[in-house]
């Protein structure tokens, strides 16, 4: 979302070159710039494979903030404006955000309402970028295709943690066991936090639980 604010303010463009030849800011945010999970060495040509990459996210943020503090940048662009008083960056941009369940609920709802972003920017972020690329969702395996937006994952036809939510649903989960999933068209969202790190328990539990949450939300 913070990069979307930069785009709305005219400070950056998703099409601007970044990293390897042919790569852009959009490639980095959609995990298609060719980096490995924790390596800046090329694992695939740019725009040919979806390889989830913390390095790509960190590199994109570093390129945007320059000498500024990433924590302050996120607070200025997102946290303060949405009223996320319990949320802060306490580590690397790709995996260092901590906060409360309440704040995560507010954050998920902001995507539904497009709080802090132009609607057109929100919709672009949640639309697949190079949607036909194959790739791997960490913990859930390989998918053909493996659609991803400009930050959040897009479900598409993947049968995994998003359960039976519609193809245009988007969200993210982390190694902490937290998740956020939302569908703008249906105007529903679900979040969860955990005291147990992501693992086999989540792979087995989330799909059915998340499907049930959607059923209950649409019936309410």
List the predicted regions and their residue ranges.
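Catalytic loop of the DD-peptidase/beta-lactamase superfamily, centered on the K-T-G motif
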Residues: 11, 48-51, 65-80, 89-220
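Active-site-proximal loop and beta-strand segments within enzyme catalytic domains
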Residues: 1-72
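Secretory-pathway/luminal and periplasmic proteins that interact with or process carbohydrate-rich
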Residues: 20-23, 34-39, 81-89, 130-137
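The feature captures the short pre-catalytic strand/loop hairpin that immediately precedes
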Residues: 38-44, 86, 160-162
């Amino acid at each position: 979302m913070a990069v979307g604010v930069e785009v709305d303010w005219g400070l950056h463009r998703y099409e601007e070159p970044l990293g390897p030849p042919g790569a852009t800011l959009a490639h980095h945010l959609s995990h298609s710039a060719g980096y490995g999970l924790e390596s800046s060495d090329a694992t695939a040509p740019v725009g040919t494979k979806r390889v989830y990459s913390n390095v790509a996210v960190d590199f994109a943020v570093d390129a945007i903030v320059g000498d500024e503090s990433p924590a302050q940048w996120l607070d200025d662009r997102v946290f303060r404006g949405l009223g996320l008083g319990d949320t802060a960056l306490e580590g690397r941009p790709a995996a260092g955000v901590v906060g409360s369940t309440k704040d995560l609920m507010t954050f998920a709802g902001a995507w539904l309402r497009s709080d802090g972003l132009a609607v057109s920017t929100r919709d672009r972020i949640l639309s697949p970028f190079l949607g036909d690329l194959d790739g791997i969702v960490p913990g859930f395996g390989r998918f053909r295709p493996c659609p991803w937006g400009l930050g959040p994952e897009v479900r598409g036809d993947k049968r995994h943690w998003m359960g039976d939510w519609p193809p245009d649903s988007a969200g993210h989960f982390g190694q902490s066991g937290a998740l956020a999933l939302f569908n703008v068209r249906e105007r529903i969202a679900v979040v969860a936090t955990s005291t147990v790190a992501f693992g086999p328990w989540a792979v087995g539990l989330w799909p059915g639980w998340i499907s049930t949450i959607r059923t209950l939300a649409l019936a309410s």
